[in-house]
């Protein structure tokens, strides 16, 4: 395995761990991580979590974005933020869906 591939694997493992911790710290419910790399051409990993209300969903997404931005990790796209019934955060090879 090339050094770059090892680095990317370590980075993705650290990112998955960080996202799971942030979701747990923000009291997200029903947290599931799904490996879809062999089933999707769009992404490799999907996190799915739920909040108790639209306010909670928005707070979870806000905290996730804020904490990851501190490590210079910014979402490529955000969907559903205005209504906050569900919010999709696109981090390229990793998606986070909070509903």
PLM segments and residue spans:
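Short glycine-rich anion-binding loops that position phosphate/pyrophosphate groups of nucleotides
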Residues: 52-53, 94
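Catalytic metal-binding acidic patch
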Residues: 44-46
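C-terminal structural segments of small proteins and small subunits
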Residues: 88, 92-99
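Short hydrophobic/aromatic beta-strand micro-patches
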Residues: 48-50
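Polybasic/polar functional segments that serve as interface/processing modules
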Residues: 2-42, 54-87
